[in-house]
Amino acid sequence: MQNYSEEGLQYHLNIRKGDVGKYVILPGDPKRCAKIAEHFEDAKLVADNREYVTYTGYLDGEKVSVTSTGIGGPSASIALEELVRSGADTFVRVGTCGGIDIDVKGGDIVIATGAIRTEGTTREYAPIEFPAVANYDVVTALLQAGKKLGYTTHAGIVQCKDSFYGQHEPEVMPVSYELQQKWEAWKRLRVKASEMESAALFVVASHLGVRVGSTFLVVGNQERNAAGLENPIVHDTEAAITVAVQALRNLIAQDRQNA
């Protein structure tokens, strides 16, 4: 591949080996990075380029980082590829989602065990038959974190999409028939929630041989709203962030024990 940037510097993230830790939290929103970095010790801004912001600090004596991915699979896959090239190998995606399963309420936490590949990025990495699955170690660490912190937590499959408004206003789309029929299938299959990055992260992680898991704050659930059930709308992501940070602590402790 032709080198488009300074030697050793990743083209999009503007980082190089040594800038990030082995463990990285991946929010979508660049503005969440500083908030997450507050949970680290001695956190410092490493890079800020396009939608990609990176801070590095320490957690329980281990070098850790947070890097934003932007929205969707293409930018998330770029972030993961360049972080792995810079030395990272364990990742926790943290963000927001919309509930699908009727039992999932706004303010709850969802932990993805796998993702439905209704986006386009992963088709350039693997045949459509290949599953997008989270790493077992990371899922376990997230579940343990959610339990320890006392949050209402749901683990299961999430739907990963490219069009935000294709979910929320499918009836106005030219392919409304397909979107609405598939949405009914996801409901019958008890899919927990809908979001936009996990499928890409899981498939790219399988390709690169690294560990990735995802956790989300549920903003709300349109199915509960349609059914006339309580449907709180929650935007504060601190609960999901604390789950992600605690999961990193769990992984650090587990990896040290297994070393």
Protein language model features and the residues they cover:
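His/Asp/Glu-rich mid-to-C-terminal helical/loop segments that flank catalytic regions of hydrolases
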Residues: 222-259
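Active-site rim beta-loop-alpha module in soluble metabolic enzymes
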Residues: 132-190
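Zn-dependent metallopeptidase/amidohydrolase metal-coordination segment
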Residues: 199-233
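Flexible, glycine/charged-enriched surface loops at secondary-structure junctions
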Residues: 43-48, 150-157, 253-259
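Short acidic/polar active-site loop segments enriched in Thr and Asp
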Residues: 89-90, 192, 211
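Metabolite-binding pocket within alpha/beta catalytic cores that recognizes anionic/polar moieties
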Residues: 1-141
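Conserved active-site and cofactor/substrate-binding residues in soluble primary-metabolism enzymes
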Residues: 27-31, 71-78, 86, 104, ...
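Generic non-transmembrane alpha-helical segments
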Residues: 141-149, 204, 243-254
